[in-house]
Amino acid sequence: MADDTSNRQVVERYANALPTDFDALSRLRHADFVEDWPQSGERIRGHASYRAIHESYPGGLPTASGQKVRGSEDKWVVTPSYSPMRIVGSGDTYFIEARISYPDGDSAHFVAIVDLRDGKVARQTTYFAVPFEAPEWRADLVERM
């Protein structure tokens, strides 16, 4: 059975290395790493392909922004384009919630399901959720965040 404490530490380091600390990500990823992007129907095989995608991003990667991280203890982080907000999970499966800011000013919510094998990230399924305006018809039924 996996050691929850050490796996959580791996995932915390991994979340803080995303998306562009390529050396750290390489150390934290299993040799057979695969990442799926279900919304676009794409699969990334291997760290080298992941790195090439991010290094080729049109317009370059955005500048840093700070966010408060929620989880086992509160911390502040400053990372380029990506701010981890929360990590939950146990055993070999964890969820990372983050915010992404793109070079054109757009932003998205980011959720990654991370599966570990042999103490390294072997699989990641990533969802990108673009913010949208709430419909007026339910305005009196909800609170604005």
Model-derived features: where do they sit?
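C-terminal and inter-domain tail/linker signature
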Residues: M1-M145
